[in-house]
């Protein structure tokens, strides 16, 4: 599975992982493909728990437009885009 975000202690990370939604088939495939193709760089991809958190934040604020800067392989972009309304925009 993904490497944890280094700024979190084990207790916070364990809780965040336990309460977040696991990645679906598309995101799981993206994780595997990123690991395979990028090897040492795969740690740049956000974790599934972080993706769930980004989805939640996007929904909670009612975002209609989002700007994604610094995209790696698109995991966070997918999480944000899924949280936008049908007429929402991801730039």
Each model region followed by its residue ranges:
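A short alpha-helical cap/connector motif
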Residues: 1-91
